[in-house]
Each structure stands twice: as C-alpha cells, then as structure tokens.
Amino acid sequence: MLNKLELLLTKAGIELSLQQKQQLVAYVDMLNKWNKAYNLTSVREPEQMLVRHIMDSIVVSPYLQGHRFIDVGTGPGLPGIPLAIVRPDSHFTLLDSLGKRVRFLRQVQHELDLVNIEPVQSRVEAYSSEPPFDGVISRAFASLKDMVSWCSHLPEPIHGRFYALKGVLPEEELTILPFGISIDSVIKLNVPELEGQRHLVILKSN
C-alpha cells in the first residue's frame, strides 16, 4: 500500500517524509480494521481509502492559513488526521458527537503518536474554544449556510476562515450565505484517480 500512496503523491506533486507516508498507511490500516466492527466509512477497500480519504484530504493542505484548526463532524478523522500528519506544526481539534468515532480517534492518536490532534466528543453548537481557531474545516458535514450558522462562534473574528470540502461546486449554496459572510475563494482540487469533481470553498466574515 505504501507504493500505491507514493504513486498518488507523485501524481499530485506532494512531497512527504517516509515517516509521514508510513503514518498515513498505518491510519488506513486502522480505519480498515475498525471499519469492520464500527462501520466508520462506506469505503471498504484500503486502496480506495488512499484515494477517497487520504488524498482527498491532504490536497487541501496548501490552502490552509494559520496553525489552529477544528475539523467539525470529523467522523473517523477526515480530513483532520491526514492533515495533522502532513502539517505537524499545526494543531487540529477533531470534533464529533458519536462516542465510537471519538474512541477510534483516540486510538489512532495513541498508536500513531499524534501530538497535534485533540479528539473531542461534542455537538458543534455546544463546543467553545478560547482562543478561537484560525480555521473551521468540514467535509461532507452540512450545507455552507448551516456550517457557518452552527460554527459561527469558532473562528477568529477577523482572520479566521471556514474551509468547506465539496464535490460539485454548490453554486446555489453560494448565493444564500448568511449575512456578514462572503466568499474568500473557490479552488478546484486535483485528486489523482478520483472520479468526479472536488472543490474547496473558503469563506470569511465581512
């Protein structure tokens, strides 16, 4: 599986250390193992996890601004854990309301010795942080409007950003953003061997 990952990274133009590659593969191994009992993802094949989970997450890394991030509705740690592996100098709070997912995240944290993640079991509207985050990240979590509404208390008011990983560009969602929120940028992502479109929508407060 390491060879497959290296091929995908080369296609994407991403350079990682051997340790980072090994951590990503170990994470996929754990996800595949736990998935049989906990049903953490609908993706069943480890090599497909490399494409649809690992690569789909880490291609976002160059566009993140800051060092403190929260991944809301992280599920089994996506995109937070892959991003934490490729950005060891950043810190990621991984938020999910389901206990079984958070238990998995804590096991990953322990086995991979990830010191820059903090798994938290909570609903997003009930969670608060001081200081606020540089970025709020979501992948398949909610509509842009709901994401911003539910998470408005989390980012730093001036420089904080909302990062929403989307498939096909949600043009209708972009027209009904809450008052005081505007589009910072929309980036078309290149994920090797992934069918369909991928976009990163970055939102900011006015």
Curated annotation (Swiss-Prot):
Does this UniProt record's set of keywords contain Cytoplasm? yes
Covalent S-S links between cysteines:
none
Which compartment or compartments is the protein found in?
Cytoplasm
Q: Name one GO cellular component term.
A: cytosol
Chief location category? cytoplasm
- What reaction is this protein's catalytic activity? guanosine(527) in 16S rRNA + S-adenosyl-L-methionine = N(7)-methylguanosine(527) in 16S rRNA + S-adenosyl-L-homocysteine
Instruction: Give an example GO molecular function.
Output: rRNA (guanine-N7-)-methyltransferase activity
Question: Any idea which positions bind S-adenosyl-L-methionine?
Answer: 73, 78, 124-125, 139
Top-level division of the source organism's lineage: Bacteria
The UniProt record lists the EC number as 2.1.1.170
Q: If you read the UniProt record, what top EC class would you report for this enzyme, in one word?
A: transferase
Q: Which InterPro entries match?
A: rRNA_ssu_MeTfrase_G (IPR003682), SAM-dependent_MTases_sf (IPR029063)
Say yes or no: keyword Heme present: no
Q: Keywords, A to Z?
A: Cytoplasm, Methyltransferase, rRNA processing, S-adenosyl-L-methionine, Transferase
Q: Which HAMAP family match?
A: 16SrRNA_methyltr_G
Q: Which family does it belong to?
A: Belongs to the methyltransferase superfamily. RNA methyltransferase RsmG family.
Q: What does this protein do?
A: Specifically methylates the N7 position of guanine in position 527 of 16S rRNA.
Q: What's the protein here called?
A: Ribosomal RNA small subunit methyltransferase G
Gene that codes for this? Answer: rsmG
